[in-house]
């Protein structure tokens, strides 16, 4: 009995150690935890998601970023000794354990309550902060198992439970509605990365019962291991988890992988430094038993994307918890990379899903493949599978160029099967053998499956095939996807794709965009997507779209829709992704959709609405008296229901303010507090010019920032307030007042432009003119301009009309120190001359016409952009007495980087042009080369330094090199608060490289630099 008590005590100790993950699981940060909010608002998650999925954030236990449910706990024999259900004490985030994902100290939580409960059950022998070795804890487990005569079963490096494997390696998925276009593209890139390297296939969910849901959850980065079955399961890509490598890691769990460092042979390869582990996180470093783990014959993989980093769950950012052993060269391998799948990851996944020994996933738009050994014969008993996956909306054209297989009746022995889809159960396009080359095969969608088997000893050449993805074509089905060529990567140049979509008779075609990013142009002249209401290019035009704003949902009037995508040969963007489906107008039914007042048809559904002064009742069909109404006073006050107390949930208030003709209405908010942030997805107020819900939108507002004064374009204004069913705030109080628009009659008497103001108006002159003393007329202005703004437009005098004769204009443009001036011409038409001797525009590389000339321009051809070498540029336009033309219009902006000269006087360098006003932009790569005179070095002083922090400075950083290029001695890579002291070069040049990624941005940096006499060696001043 004493032995059993001891064994149970040991088991409970191990259970408590494992369950240290209860609300103790790590808070996530992408290379920095600075922006992770401990008081996470649950309602900032994806509220609109209606899928009842298996939520990893509600797991019984967490093991790092792995969610364990009751079924998983049985694997640990945690099955009834005590009630181990999770007790929530605050919301926690999780980390994938990758390189640079620092985890701060954890708060006390339910672990301590659990230990209390263990003690109350009579297990008093283990103190809370026990340093008992993990292996001894496991000894207790083995004793319990032995006593029960039950074979121990614990998680493996790759799951060994057949029900956790996705059948056929096919994983259906849904991407939740809260992700941006760039995040959606990144999620698809991560899935395509797994597809490219293995035989796992991700497909958009159709009618599958089990599938994964990408969602934004409060537990950060978190997932179950393998397939849960019996419905959807979530993979949480929460705050700061939207990095390619982190998503690849989390997908590794979905596919069926545990963490690499839990293997039984890990002590031969790494050392766990227990003293550096955060209290309560020891369970994350439990090692499995040799008899229980099957790593599928793969050696220990330091490079695995499933391996923890050296400092995961460390007490301090620079303290190791996992120390890799040195290799034969005495070097410790890097661990914890979150960049791509390792060779070991790929090999293990192929074994787990029993991928055929030959074949691959082909994702390029063109490609080729052939049988093993081609053209020298293929071996017997061979099995190969090729999966071709191109962009949805494209079709695959497969052409066999050679065919020499053993011929048999019904191609029974050696054969090739081609299927129209993503797997072996897709419709068969053909089964081939012998030496007759098949006809060209064309898929109906964007995937094709090619399987080759040989079972004879006959030796033939084999086969060879080429394929090509073609965009556009006839699409006759009720739902599907269309994406720009090469999505989620940038679309290809010089493409033209035409799709003709037909759905069932009696329906219209609905088109909804998830992602849209096409080269921007005012008239969409370069790259664009054109949509027409019919089947031909002569059908009525619905719209021609470009830029970065997603088009509104589109509905055709018939069961046909025509789409054309065009890209030119220059700028390429991310493109678009859209879903199409058959659409029915439920509002045309005799019962008006069951709505009491108004029925509003929406894509895929409908909704009821009410007349002004009414709102929907809880049944969402009938209407009842509401807030809002028609207001005809010249001034008044509007407040949310219940003001100044919190507004109620599920409210929809519409105020329609109408003023006399020639009046404009202004709205000024006195107080403002609504749920939400910049997204305004939950509670919000919309202000529009006009009375309808689709009139011009001035803004959609939420949060606590008081909006600026809003003035209508017409004599009416619509204000709509909506609240959802959860969080309520104080609301808003606003005053409206009407003002006569003097500009609406005779342009206010202004010669050029009339600008209406509250209570009055002002006249304004076009470019090249100034206002006359009478405040209405315009006269020709002096033409000297000093420009200090980071961006703007400049143009010739009198633009867009012809410039005057005998005119001289100058522009003295100054950019932020460390940034160069860039001039990009939008239009250009100046009198032509071979040497530009008459009318011309000159650009000088400095602050006057005494500096080096960059260019002298005339004619009708738009010049290439002009870029200064320093932070100043001087432009001079001169016209003579004869011919006048339209002139020019150009945009001035800034370019970072360049060559800078260090002198005795101190100079400045800023990280970005809008330093002090805005954080630095994303996707930045800038290089500055600072050069001193021969015999002098360079002193750098960082007066401000605030760059996204991360242990290895992997995301945003500044690199310094003691020389002219990156081959020189590297002084260091800095992020966070940067170097604390002055830096000196050992030579006469310093190269500065600044990089930022596409997520978190900070204030940036300000460097003062000067030349100084050489120091004996590179050093910092203490």
Curated annotation (Swiss-Prot):
<feature type="domain" description="CUB 4">
    <location>
        <begin position="783"/>
        <end position="895"/>
    </location>
</feature>
<dbReference type="InterPro" id="IPR015446">
    <property type="entry name" value="BMP_1/tolloid-like"/>
</dbReference>
<feature type="disulfide bond">
    <location>
        <begin position="221"/>
        <end position="222"/>
    </location>
</feature>
<feature type="disulfide bond">
    <location>
        <begin position="896"/>
        <end position="926"/>
    </location>
</feature>
<keyword id="KW-0482">Metalloprotease</keyword>
<feature type="disulfide bond">
    <location>
        <begin position="610"/>
        <end position="623"/>
    </location>
</feature>
<feature type="domain" description="CUB 5">
    <location>
        <begin position="896"/>
        <end position="1012"/>
    </location>
</feature>
<dbReference type="GO" id="GO:0016485">
    <property type="term" value="P:protein processing"/>
</dbReference>
<feature type="disulfide bond">
    <location>
        <begin position="743"/>
        <end position="754"/>
    </location>
</feature>
<feature type="disulfide bond">
    <location>
        <begin position="627"/>
        <end position="653"/>
    </location>
</feature>
<feature type="active site">
    <location>
        <position position="250"/>
    </location>
</feature>
<dbReference type="GO" id="GO:0001885">
    <property type="term" value="P:endothelial cell development"/>
</dbReference>
<feature type="disulfide bond">
    <location>
        <begin position="199"/>
        <end position="355"/>
    </location>
</feature>
<dbReference type="GO" id="GO:0005576">
    <property type="term" value="C:extracellular region"/>
</dbReference>
<dbReference type="GO" id="GO:0005509">
    <property type="term" value="F:calcium ion binding"/>
</dbReference>
<feature type="domain" description="Peptidase M12A">
    <location>
        <begin position="157"/>
        <end position="356"/>
    </location>
</feature>
<dbReference type="InterPro" id="IPR034036">
    <property type="entry name" value="ZnMP_TLD/BMP1"/>
</dbReference>
<feature type="glycosylation site" description="N-linked (GlcNAc...) asparagine">
    <location>
        <position position="129"/>
    </location>
</feature>
<feature type="disulfide bond">
    <location>
        <begin position="471"/>
        <end position="497"/>
    </location>
</feature>
<keyword id="KW-0862">Zinc</keyword>
<dbReference type="InterPro" id="IPR035914">
    <property type="entry name" value="Sperma_CUB_dom_sf"/>
</dbReference>
<dbReference type="InterPro" id="IPR001881">
    <property type="entry name" value="EGF-like_Ca-bd_dom"/>
</dbReference>
<dbReference type="GO" id="GO:0005615">
    <property type="term" value="C:extracellular space"/>
</dbReference>
<dbReference type="GO" id="GO:0001707">
    <property type="term" value="P:mesoderm formation"/>
</dbReference>
<feature type="disulfide bond">
    <location>
        <begin position="595"/>
        <end position="608"/>
    </location>
</feature>
<keyword id="KW-0378">Hydrolase</keyword>
<dbReference type="GO" id="GO:0035162">
    <property type="term" value="P:embryonic hemopoiesis"/>
</dbReference>
<feature type="disulfide bond">
    <location>
        <begin position="765"/>
        <end position="778"/>
    </location>
</feature>
<dbReference type="GO" id="GO:0008270">
    <property type="term" value="F:zinc ion binding"/>
</dbReference>
<keyword id="KW-0645">Protease</keyword>
<dbReference type="Pfam" id="PF14670">
    <property type="entry name" value="FXa_inhibition"/>
</dbReference>
<dbReference type="InterPro" id="IPR006026">
    <property type="entry name" value="Peptidase_Metallo"/>
</dbReference>
<feature type="disulfide bond">
    <location>
        <begin position="358"/>
        <end position="384"/>
    </location>
</feature>
<dbReference type="GO" id="GO:0036342">
    <property type="term" value="P:post-anal tail morphogenesis"/>
</dbReference>
<feature type="disulfide bond">
    <location>
        <begin position="411"/>
        <end position="433"/>
    </location>
</feature>
<feature type="disulfide bond">
    <location>
        <begin position="524"/>
        <end position="546"/>
    </location>
</feature>
<dbReference type="GO" id="GO:0048264">
    <property type="term" value="P:determination of ventral identity"/>
</dbReference>
<feature type="disulfide bond">
    <location>
        <begin position="783"/>
        <end position="809"/>
    </location>
</feature>
<dbReference type="GO" id="GO:0008237">
    <property type="term" value="F:metallopeptidase activity"/>
</dbReference>
<feature type="domain" description="CUB 2">
    <location>
        <begin position="471"/>
        <end position="583"/>
    </location>
</feature>
<dbReference type="GO" id="GO:0030513">
    <property type="term" value="P:positive regulation of BMP signaling pathway"/>
</dbReference>
<feature type="domain" description="EGF-like 1; calcium-binding">
    <location>
        <begin position="583"/>
        <end position="624"/>
    </location>
</feature>
């Amino acid at each position: 009995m004493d032995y059993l008590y001891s064994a149970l005590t040991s088991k409970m100790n191990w259970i408590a150690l494992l369950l240290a993950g209860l609300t103790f699981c790590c808070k996530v940060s992408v290379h920095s935890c600075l922006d992770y909010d401990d008081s996470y608002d649950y309602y900032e998650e994806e509220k609109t998601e209606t899928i009842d999925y298996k939520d990893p954030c509600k797991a019984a236990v967490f093991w790092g970023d792995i969610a364990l449910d009751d079924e998983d706990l049985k694997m640990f024999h945690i099955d009834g000794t005590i009630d181990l259900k999770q007790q929530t004490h605050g919301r926690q985030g999780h980390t994938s354990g990758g390189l640079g994902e620092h985890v701060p100290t954890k708060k006390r939580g339910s672990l301590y309550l659990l230990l209390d409960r263990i003690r109350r059950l009579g297990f008093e022998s283990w103190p809370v902060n026990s340093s008992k070795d993990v292996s001894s804890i496991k000894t207790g487990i083995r004793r319990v198992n032995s006593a029960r005569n039950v074979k121990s079963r614990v998680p493996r490096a790759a799951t060994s439970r057949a029900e956790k494997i996705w059948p056929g390696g096919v994983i259906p998925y849904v991407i939740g509605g809260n992700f941006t276009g760039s995040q959606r593209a990144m999620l698809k890139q991560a899935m395509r990365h797994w597809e490219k390297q293995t035989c796992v296939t991700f497909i958009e969910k159709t009618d599958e019962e089990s599938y994964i849901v990408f969602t934004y959850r409060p537990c950060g980065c978190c997932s179950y291991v393998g397939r849960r079955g019996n419905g959807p399961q979530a993979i949480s890509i929460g705050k700061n988890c939207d990095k390619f490598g982190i998503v690849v890691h989390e997908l590794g769990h979905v596919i069926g992988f545990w963490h690499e460092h839990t293997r039984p042979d890990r002590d031969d390869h790494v050392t766990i430094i227990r003293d550096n582990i955060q209290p309560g996180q020891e369970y994350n470093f439990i090692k499995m038993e040799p008899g229980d783990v099957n790593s599928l014959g793969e050696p220990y993989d330091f490079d695995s994307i499933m391996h923890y980093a050296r400092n995961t769950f460390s007490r301090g950012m620079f303290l190791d918890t996992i120390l890799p052993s040195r290799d034969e060269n005495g070097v410790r391998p890097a661990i914890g990379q979150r960049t791509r799948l390792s060779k070991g990851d790929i090999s293990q996944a192929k074994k787990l899903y029993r991928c055929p020994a030959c074949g691959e996933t082909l994702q390029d738009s063109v490609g080729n493949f052939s049988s093993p050994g081609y053209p020298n014969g293929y071996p017997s008993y061979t099995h190969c599978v090729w999966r071709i996956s191109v962009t949805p909306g494209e079709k695959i054209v497969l052409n066999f160029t050679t065919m020499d297989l053993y011929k048999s009746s019904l191609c029974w022995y050696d054969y090739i099967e081609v299927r129209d889809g993503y797997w072996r159960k897709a419709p068969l396009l053909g089964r081939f053998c012998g030496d007759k080359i098949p006809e060209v095969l064309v898929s109906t969608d964007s995937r094709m499956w090619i399987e080759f088997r040989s079972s004879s000893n006959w030796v033939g050449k084999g086969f060879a095939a080429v394929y090509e993805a073609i965009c556009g074509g006839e699409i006759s089905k009720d739902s599907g996807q269309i994406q720009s060529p090469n999505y989620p990567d940038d679309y290809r140049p010089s493409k033209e794709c035409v799709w003709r979509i037909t759905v069932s008779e009696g329906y219209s075609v609905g088109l909804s965009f998830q992602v849209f990013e096409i080269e921007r142009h005012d008239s969409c002249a370069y790259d664009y997507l054109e949509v027409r209401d019919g089947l031909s290019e002569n059908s009525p035009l619905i719209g021609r779209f470009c830029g970065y704003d997603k088009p509104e949902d589109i509905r055709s009037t018939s069961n046909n829709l025509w789409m054309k995508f065009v890209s030119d040969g220059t700028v390429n963007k991310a493109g678009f992704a859209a879903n199409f489906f058959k659409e029915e107008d439920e509002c045309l039914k005799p019962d008006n959709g069951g709505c009491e007042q108004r029925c509003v048809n929406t894509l895929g559904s409908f909704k009821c609405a009410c007349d002004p002064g009414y709102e929907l009742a809880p049944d969402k069909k009938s209407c009842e008296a509401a807030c809002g109404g028609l207001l005809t006073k010249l001034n008044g006050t509007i407040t949310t229901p219940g003001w100044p107390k919190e507004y109620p949930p599920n409210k929809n208030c519409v105020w329609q303010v109408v003023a006399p003709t020639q009046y404009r209405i202004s709205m000024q908010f006195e107080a403002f507090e609504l749920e939400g942030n910049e997204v305004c997805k939950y509670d919000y107020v919309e202000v529009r010019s006009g009375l309808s819900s689709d009139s011009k939108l001035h803004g959609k507002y939420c949060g606590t920032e008081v909006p600026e004064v809003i003035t209508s374009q017409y004599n009416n204004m619509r204000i709509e307030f909506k609240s959802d069913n959860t969080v309520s705030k104080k609301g808003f109080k606003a005053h409206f007042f009407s003002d006569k628009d003097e500009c609406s009659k005779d342009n206010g008497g202004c010669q050029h432009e009339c600008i209406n103001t509250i209570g009055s108006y002002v006249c304004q002159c076009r470019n090249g003119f100034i206002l006359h003393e009478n405040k209405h007329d315009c006269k020709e202005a002096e033409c000297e301009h000093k420009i200090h703004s980071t961006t703007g437009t400049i143009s010739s005098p009198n633009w867009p009309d012809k410039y005057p004769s005998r005119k001289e204009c100058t522009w003295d443009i100054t950019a932020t120190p460390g940034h160069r001036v860039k001039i990009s011409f939008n239009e250009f038409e100046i009198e032509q001359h071979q040497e530009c001797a008459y009318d011309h525009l000159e650009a000088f590389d400095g602050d006057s016409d005494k500096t080096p000339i960059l260019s002298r321009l005339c004619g009708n051809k738009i010049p290439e952009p002009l870029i200064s070498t320093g932070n100043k540029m001087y432009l001079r336009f001169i016209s003579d007495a004869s011919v006048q033309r339209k002139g020019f219009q150009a945009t001035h902006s800034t370019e970072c980087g360049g060559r800078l000269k260090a002198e005795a006087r101190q100079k400045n360098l800023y990280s970005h042009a809008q330093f002090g006003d805005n954080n630095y932009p994303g996707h930045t790569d800038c290089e500055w080369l600072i050069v001193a005179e021969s015999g002098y070095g360079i002193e750098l002083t960082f007066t401000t330094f605030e760059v996204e922090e991360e242990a290895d400075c992997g995301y945003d950083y500044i690199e310094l090199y003691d020389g002219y290029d990156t081959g020189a001695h590297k002084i260091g890579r800095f992020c966070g608060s940067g170097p604390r002291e002055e830096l000196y070069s050992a030579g006469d040049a310093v190269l500065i490289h600044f990089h930022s990624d596409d997520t978190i941005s900070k204030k940036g940096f300000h460097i003062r630099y000067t030349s100084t006499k050489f120091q004996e060696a590179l050093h910092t001043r203490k």
